[in-house]
Amino acid sequence: IDLEFVAVTHLHSGHVGGLETLLDDGDITIGKIYLKPFIGTNLAQWDKCVHDGDALYQSLNKKAQSMNIPVIDCVPDEPFALGNWALRFFNTEPDSYHKNICENDNSFALLAEQGCRRILLAGDMINDTGDLVRLANAVGRVDALKVPCHGERAVPQEALDKLRPDTLIITNRLAEISDDVLVGIMSAFGRRAYSTSDSGGIALT
């Protein structure tokens, strides 16, 4: 299996933990890794203690360098091609100015487009500093949305009104999804919603 790249949305173990397993698998090759630099000076103390993003960053960098896999810490914000798809990262700059944030504020999102099809993978992006609203305004209408932050945090109505996805993917158990998310996304739009715990692995075709 050849992976052209792996994108690490942010430095929380739930989004990074499986990468070393991929790196250790001799049947998988990775062309490069997109990973924003870790900036801990403005992170809330609880986030540093619970997740230790600095250790994750150092470990991944060391492992990748030992395997001669480039780590791209200046994540591009211009569209680029992957086969027949056009991809674009959003929220690519580390947040170095807001105070007492969590690492989710540094999560980037990935928009994939092919013809009229548009899929938004929103990582763990939250709206504490307005990121989700800015993202929705920049992206507009999508066909499918990987719901940010596992559905545990509410998505602002302003963002939902812009995105209006037909299909929603939630990487969580439905029982752990925020009531605000269930009401704001599933009920308001009556769209198809799938959770990985109930549906298993999910592939968009």
Give the positions of each predicted feature.
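Core dinuclear metal-dependent hydrolase active-site scaffold
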Residues: 1, 65-141, 200-205
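Active-site metal-binding motif and surrounding structural segment of the metallo-beta-lactamase
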Residues: 1-39, 135-152, 164-168
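Acidic, metal-coordinating catalytic cores used for nucleic-acid/nucleotide bond scission
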Residues: 10-15, 50, 151-155, 174-179
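Active-site metal-binding loops of divalent metal-dependent hydrolases
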Residues: 10-11, 38, 76, 92-94, ...
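Short acidic, gly/pro-rich beta-turn/loop elements at beta-sheet edges
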Residues: 16, 43, 120
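A short acidic, amphipathic alpha-helical/loop segment
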Residues: 18-22, 131-135, 155-163, 180-185
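Binuclear metal-ion centers of metallo-dependent hydrolases, dominated by the metallo-beta-lactamase
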Residues: 32, 40-88, 101-104, 167-205
